[in-house]
């Protein structure tokens, strides 16, 4: 028995210690029995920060939020059985949004599998193709070879999670009883250290000089170009992309999640209203770029994606460090396996300065005309969902974070988050674009990003109410703006809206809940606003005071649809008139 406890303590102690040496210092733990030894060791290790979350589905997204904000791996620990299955949605999102999660699941030992033992199920490759790597850890043994194995396996798994494209990995730990480690053992954290501990160094892909010279030569003869920056771009992409734009004269179509629309950098070349003006048929038929250079994931804007797909005669250069490029439009003609920064740096160094021509001025002019028209909605007294975004940005302080939920909030952010000299970070879950786990992801991000404002619809808010517990347990500061249109507002913009007979029951799905009681239960403040002045006051109060603050603004789905369509129609008229004037 003592040999078992000694082996358990030293073996798992080496694993936990190696995590901290590899800078995995945050773990979200869901309570359970079989995971006891790992949980206790993590709690005891001075280099590890532990966060409790009792709901595994919310816990998975909470860890995802921390990892997104810190831009480094975060561990996630649960017991055996369906607890591990509840991590699945967060693992899927982490995989597709390229976020490194270290998923740790405790398991029954092999003799208790497939024999009807309680809380035992097949956890081998549980997450299938949604993790970059899976390993079934060996049972604890008291030997230097096994301590060495524990550390080296940890190194391999962390390296896999961090190698482009980043993503989740899964380690499954079979453990026998008894489960309580012995903390009186000498040198508990030192086993397997020293000569056995290695460090995985990851280099950057280098741009071949021959290709750079060739590309510079070609681009020098292509006056009509576009730089498209989507989600998952490098954190320093703004400075490099704007320099490249200045050299080439190509406008930057900046997705809000690229974080190029706001900040202290020069935004002369940044186009922010393309989602609206690329709906114009005359513009789409007459504006034909020679080359499109794309960084990061595909943009939120459907109009931009459709525009990209129509450019069948253009050169499409997709830059992706991993080589697993994202191209749902199926138009890529060249894929460059390099980091955004390496690509931009190589071109900036050798690219001659190309004068800003009529091509850039056309985009800039239409963008300004579109923005002028869209800003008219700031005079609307009605609770228009687009204005929710502009009014939040108006009161957000320097360095704040705006987290946009999926469905309508991220689309309104795309349409109405205009360029700003304030440094405002925009975040969202755009891996698989689900509405689950949004509250938890935002709360995880708020551990690092303060102040943070989450904009979320009422259905998405309902979907992750359990996530609010983290705000109470960990005393987090967050302001949540709930846009309550009593249902799935996005479906009003889709063809399903025309099927009136079944629309409300299948798509509108009103739930008629009063969220004030729930927010109060979790120790937060709740305010239901009436008017834009009160809305701005409540949001500002939220970002300047501690704790959980929920601000609810009620909108009407049909009225919101009409306002969007009216604004779009007016904008299209302005654009068409402007284009026809230019052609004369």
From Swiss-Prot:
Any one of the GO BP annotations: menaquinone biosynthetic process
Domain of life according to the entry: Bacteria
Known EC number: 2.2.1.9
Cofactor(s) required, per the database record: Mg(2+); Mn(2+); thiamine diphosphate
Cofactor note: Binds 1 thiamine pyrophosphate per subunit.
GO molecular function, one term: thiamine pyrophosphate binding
Pathway recorded for this protein: Quinol/quinone metabolism; 1,4-dihydroxy-2-naphthoate biosynthesis; 1,4-dihydroxy-2-naphthoate from chorismate: step 2/7; Quinol/quinone metabolism; menaquinone biosynthesis
Entry keyword annotation includes Metal-binding: yes
Catalytic reactions on record: isochorismate + 2-oxoglutarate + H(+) = 5-enolpyruvoyl-6-hydroxy-2-succinyl-cyclohex-3-ene-1-carboxylate + CO2
Keywords attached to this entry: Magnesium, Manganese, Menaquinone biosynthesis, Metal-binding, Thiamine pyrophosphate, Transferase
Quaternary state and interactors: Homodimer.
Record function comment: Catalyzes the thiamine diphosphate-dependent decarboxylation of 2-oxoglutarate and the subsequent addition of the resulting succinic semialdehyde-thiamine pyrophosphate anion to isochorismate to yield 2-succinyl-5-enolpyruvyl-6-hydroxy-3-cyclohexene-1-carboxylate (SEPHCHC).
Alphabetical list of HAMAP family matching this protein: MenD (MF_01659)
Family per record: Belongs to the TPP enzyme family. MenD subfamily.
Protein's recorded name: 2-succinyl-5-enolpyruvyl-6-hydroxy-3-cyclohexene-1-carboxylate synthase
Organism: Bacillus anthracis
Organism classification: Bacteria, Bacillati, Bacillota, Bacilli, Bacillales
